[in-house]
Amino acid sequence: MGDAMDFDDSAALLEQVNRALENATPLRIQGANSKAFLGRIVGGEILDTRAHRGIVSYDPTELVITARCGTPLVELLAVLDASQQMLACEPPAFADDATVGGMVATGLSGPRRPWSGSVRDFVLGTRIITGHGKHLRFGGEVMKNVAGYDLSRLMAGSYGSLGVITEVSLKVLPKPRACLSLSLEMPSEQALLRLAEWGQQPLPISAACHDGRQLHLRLEGGEGSVAAAHDRLGGEPLNSSFWADLNEQHLGFFDEDQPLWRLSVPLNTPPLNLPGEQWLDWGGAQRWLKSTAEAAIIRKVVGDVGGHATCYNHGLIDEPFHPLAPALLHYHRQLKRQLDPRGIFNPGRLYAEL
């Protein structure tokens, strides 16, 4: 895009990977390190992606943007905002210098996720340095091109364990014309029932969170539909900054006085019988739990309803991610061996076996 900060550092990244392959040196891939608290502790030589940055291409009419992995997420969002467009999955940054590569590698999505999709759903194509020492392109840069989608999307949420993402093409969407946030007093049990009921109706809900006392809603869409939904649902006005604070974990609930767990459960799961304080997010499909209960107890309760639990405190437990079933772990190990046969990329970040 011609910015003075644009720089293609892919040759240096490829050289470092090939040197690591020759010497069997594990690599710890990182950008701004803003999400280092997620996953297992990783050793190895640091591969820093931040110098490889810049918007490669952006066509607002095609709803596609392509950026290098070290591009600060805030810069990409500013470019989109100038054209009244957005990343609909609302990825959290957790730091001002968080990178696009880290956004894709962790695959984290914000409050809009159940209504718009995840980071993975918006990945159209990638360029990746593989464990074979090759710099390859997968997928496309237009929405109609489906070649290579699966491999590109596998990078989302892989935590750098399958390769070095050097470039990514993302689908973007127009910003909604109207947005209104509301709060309604009700217990969590009633909130889940109401959300299940509203989910069957054409309401422009784009975020829903219950903080143990109030149900917070965000309405987005055309001015008429948002106004009509407000008239129907009622509620008191809520500052729209609530959603960014929730997404970035700036609210008091997220203060680190107790271990923090992210619980992913089926949408209509009743309140979980676990010690500690819980918030409902994603309309109930994501629960935030602050609890000193043992990991095995939390995962047993969550697993019994078909969900999984991730610990958000770095180094607190040996396995922060929910254990995989044997068949699924076998599949993950096969995939790792195919893409990273020497096992140099973020070894053990997700699981000890990977």
Segments from the language model and where they lie:
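Short beta-strand
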Residues: 28-29, 206-211, 278-282, 311
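Short, conserved charged micro-motifs
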Residues: 74-76, 189-194, 223-231, 268-275, ...
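Conserved glycine-rich FAD pyrophosphate-binding loop
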Residues: 40-42, 95, 236-354
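C-terminal substrate-binding/cap subdomain adjacent to the FAD-binding core in PCMH-type
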Residues: 105, 124-259
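Short amphipathic beta-strand starts and helix->beta connectors
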Residues: 49-52, 164-169, 198-207, 271-277, ...
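N-terminal accessory segments
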Residues: 1-34, 302-326
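N-terminal glycine-rich flavin-associated loop
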Residues: 2-29, 49-96, 108-141, 176-186
